[in-house]
């Protein structure tokens, strides 16, 4: 499906229907996020700089907290693992369980913390098409680029995440999430 690029831009054209374009962009993002609600089994593969590849299986639950809020929609991301693994011994900065709250405001997702630290962060969002979003975040010397695509009528999510620390690529993460 071809999309009108002006609805995906963060800069709205100077025309009389620019508010309509903004509403379409916002509703497209809200619709995409609503397709992610539920519990997902996440199979992850981590490539760390100059280390062996590490695999991990986790669960993530995505909930919408306040559907009727006119200031933005709030989501809660809860993750956990059900199997013991040495991943968290090798990588103590990662948490085997946790919660992040996030609010969607237009083309930005404001999160209570990042995955690599406890600092609040904002991700800028670009919509590739009706199935894929790109999130771009910067916090505490980290720059994170994440591509998330819904596949096969939303039964699967594919995530590719690239993380640079002080301008050096440190982590590449591939995930396949299966809707439970």
Task: Describe the residue ranges of each PLM region.
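Calycin-type beta-barrel ligand-binding domains and close structural analogs
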Residues: 3-21, 83-180
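Amphipathic/hydrophobic helical signal segments and adjacent flexible N-terminal regions
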Residues: 1-97, 171, 180
